[in-house]
């Protein structure tokens, strides 16, 4: 009788441990998927910004032809940022720093471009430019929100 109770107690302990380990594993998988999803949202917003840049550069070219160096800086920063990608299943601190650095350079180039464009009142009156600028500002806000969400999840 005593052996029978011991066997049942051992079986119960093993079952409890099994379900606890399974629950921990499922929680880890769920968190990992959450991190991947949050990162993909960050990437989506960065891609949206990169998609707006060619239209912005083309609009500005006609008005600020002699600002070639600034425009080339934006185009080159965009190209560099496009080359730098991260595999969501292999997020490392080093790869995140490299990605953020490339995106930061692009953001700086866009900021310089916007400062230069303050000198062109005709451009500021262009409806297409104003819409692109508003979309770019909205995208920058979305990037900030998605990065915050990613940091909360990660």
Where are these regions (language model features)?
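A helix-centric hydrophobic-segment signal that preferentially recognizes long
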Residues: 1-154
